[in-house]
Structures are given as C-alpha cells and as structure tokens.
Amino acid sequence: MRRLIVTGIATSTAKGFRRVVNPNLLGGGAAARAFSDYREKLRTGFLHSIRFEDAFALFFEMVHSQPLPSIVDFTRLLTATANLRRYETVIYFSQKMELYGISHDLYSFTILIHCFCRCSRLSFALSVLGKMMKLGYEPSIVTFGSLLHGFCLVNRIGDAFSLVILMVKSGYEPNVVVYNTLIDGLCKNGELNIALELLNEMEKKGLGADVVTYNTLLTGLCYSGRWSDAARMLRDMMKRSINPDVVTFTALIDVFVKQGNLDEAQELYKEMIQSSVDPNNVTYNSIINGLCMHGRLYDAKKTFDLMASKGCFPNVVTYNTLISGFCKFRMVDEGMKLFQRMSCEGFNADIFTYNTLIHGYCQVGKLRVALDIFCWMVSRRVTPDIITHCILLHGLCVNGEIESALVKFDDMRESEKYIGIVAYNIMIHGLCKADKVEKAWELFCRLPVEGVKPDARTYTIMILGLCKNGPRREADELIRRMKEEGIICQMNAEDDHLEEHSSSNKEISLVS
C-alpha cells in the first residue's frame, strides 16, 4: 500500500540529481585546519559547535580516509551541517559521497530531501524520494514532514494536503509536527479558518497542540487584524498550561508595532519580563523598528541602549534599523555616529547600511558626504547595487548637479545590463526640473529602443514637463497614449497634487 507514494508523489524521476550542485560553487580550496583522527571528532562534542569551514575540512578528511567511514559517520556530519542551515553544502557533500561510492541509507536520504526542500527544489526532493523507495527504503514520518514543509514553502498547500491523504492511506498517522506544518502554510496563505479547523481536528484526535501551534495561529490572526480571536487564542493557550515563550511574545509585539499600537507593544514587553521570558534580538529589533517608524527616535535609542544592559547585544539588523530611523527624519549625523560605533564593535556594514546613509545625506543636501560614503563602501568591497546608483542619481538631480547626473546615468547604462524604468524616471524628472525638457523628451523617446517600458510615473513626469516648458502637442499625444494603455486614471489621481508627487521623498520611494 505504501507504494502508492511512489506513483502519487515521486512523479519526478531522479534525472538531473547529480547535476544539481556545481562542484565549484563552494570553492574546493576552502580553508582546512588539521584535524586529529576524524573518529575522535565524531565521538566528542565537536559536531555540536562545528563551524562551516571545519565541516568542509572534516568531510574531505573523511572521504580521503582508508577505509572509508560508514554512512552512519557521514550522516552525523550531514546532520551537523544541515543544522548550520548550509543546505547547499549538504547537497554538495551528498553528491561527492556518491562519487566516492558511499551508499545512502534512510537517514541520509531524509536529510538530503530536507535540504532540497529548504532550498525550494521540490522536483529534486521528489527524485530522491523515488530513488530511495526503489532501493527498498520506506520513508519515515520525518521524511514526509520535510516534503510537507517544502510544499508549504512554495505555497503548494493543495499538494501538501494531498501528501497527507496519501500518508494516511499508506498507514502513516500525522503527528503534531505535520499539523503544525500545515497550519503554518495555511496561515501564511491567509487561510486562517481552515487552520483553525485543523486545530479542532487535532484536539478530536487527541493530539495536544503545542506552543508552536499556538504561536503560528496567534501570528496569523494578529496580522489579519483578528484581535479578538487572537486574544481568545492566547487565553486558551494559557488555560491549557502552555506558557507563551519568547517567540509568542515577539510575534505579538512585532504585529502590534507594525499596526502602530506601540503602547500595547510596550505593555506586552513588560508582561514578558514579568513572566521571566527573556527578550532576544528579534524582540528588541521589532520594538526599535516600530518606534522608528513612528518618529519616536529618543525611545528607540533608549531601547537600543537598554539591550546591552539586559545581556542582549545589538546586531547588524539592530544598527541598520536605528540608522534608517535617524536618516528618515534627517538626523543623519546621529546615523553616522551609529555607523562608526557599529564598525568599532566589529560589525561589517552591509549594502542596506550604506544605501541608507547615502540616501540620508543626499536628502539633507550633503552630496559630498554621500559621495565619500559611496567611495568608502567600494573600498570596503561592498558592491553597489542598482538601488545605490539610483539613490546617487537622484541626489545629483535634486542638488542641481544635472550634468554630473547625466554622466552618472550614462555610466549606469554602460555598466548595468538593465537599469529599469526607475532610473529613467529619475533622470527624466531631473532634466524637466532643470528646464531641459528637450533633453528629457529625447530620453523618453529612446525608451522603446532601450527596451524599457514607460510606466504611469514616466508619463506623468514627461507630460508635466511638456506642459510647463514644452510643446502642448506632445503632451496631448502622451495623454492619448496613456488612455490607450489604460493608465489615464493614474494621471488623474496625481494631477491635483503635482508638487507633492514631484518631491524627493516620493521619487526615492520608487527606488527603495
């Protein structure tokens, strides 16, 4: 009966499995430290705290040992590597193992399926399932759990339910983990009523919901604005002696701050402390983000300083959130102080950090500082992206450096394969503002040749420029084209607020 699963699920054959990972993807020359005998490493607690580079070194020591280690030994290393969330590496190791003639067993196949699912490569996961069953291995409930998670990860909820039906027909009984996976997928798809029905089904079957079940449902209900249902769920959770954990509190706090209910979020934080649940980085990051969103920068900085005193130290996300908050409200020098502190504490600024600061200094007219940050970013080997270039382009335009903006724009077109309509909108808008409507019109007319399709914003900018400084005939022609393309409503909506929509904030929102 269980062979139903082969025909019902694993319709994808194992073709292409060996080609899924490029052997050069992770670099064969990864740093390898000298190990004592690999058996000693596997026997001790080394795997519990293994680092990525150590996993690589240990793997290559194992495959070059004589005799070769057993699949049980390799499975222990695969498990440890998967726990590091290095799923592609596990796939790479598995590929190498096959080349060395090391045969998989049920456990290693299950790990491989799990990693393919985590990488959203379901066709390969199903290929492995088919292969293992052809070799006589029956999948376990853990194997099916990984596949379920994979289906839910790519929003194939219908396929996930079909898999559960096949599991039941084949004699497998869904457990709490299976139900939790389905409930999570349903909540993320907005199917909360079905998720709640599954909770009732669990109770009827005598499967007690755990803290993960309730956390998932609470988050889904809150994000859908079903506050009364969420409150009822929380009461039911505590009534069943399932104590809220850090995930519960953090999820609720995050929802409250995003909804603008900051007072409720802070009350929940106090309740969290009173319940002896220690907030983590995610908790503090959510609170800081909410405070920054609503302009309460003093409170955000106070919370930032509070973290360390509570033994929870800021990470890159924390710094980026607060820097973004300061820059949003034009307090760029405060943002720069945090950037410098971040570097002193050993954190490497990422592309988001640099883009935020460059944008902030462009907004306050300190273009020279923005360009210096850009140069520093490149010197630190952080590669600028299209957003970085668009922010600088916009900064040059709004600060009257239109000739420099044209040079920048031409550089972007030469270096980027596709710069997109946003960059064109910024440049056309800058030219119109600088009374260079003819040049803007030339650029607009070049869009089809460049393979870039104008959007409502492009038409609006160009029509306004023509109405102010150019021939009305071309403006009328563009309005006619907008009607033909069904975007005249956008023009009407913006027509009453022309100055507002040509502001730097509105323009840059198209970039970020």
UniProtKB/Swiss-Prot annotation:
PPR repeat start-end pairs: 70-104, 105-139, 140-174, 175-209, 210-244, 245-279, 280-314, 315-349, 350-384, 385-415, 420-454, 455-489
PROSITE patterns, per database record: PPR
GO cellular component, one term: mitochondrion
Subcellular location: Mitochondrion
Keyword Mitochondrion: yes
Keyword Mitochondrion assigned: yes
Transit sequence range: 1-34
Record's protein name: Pentatricopeptide repeat-containing protein At1g64583, mitochondrial
Domain of life: Eukaryota
Stated family: Belongs to the PPR family. P subfamily.
Disulfide bridge map: none
Species: Arabidopsis thaliana (Mouse-ear cress)
Protein keywords: Mitochondrion, Repeat, Transit peptide
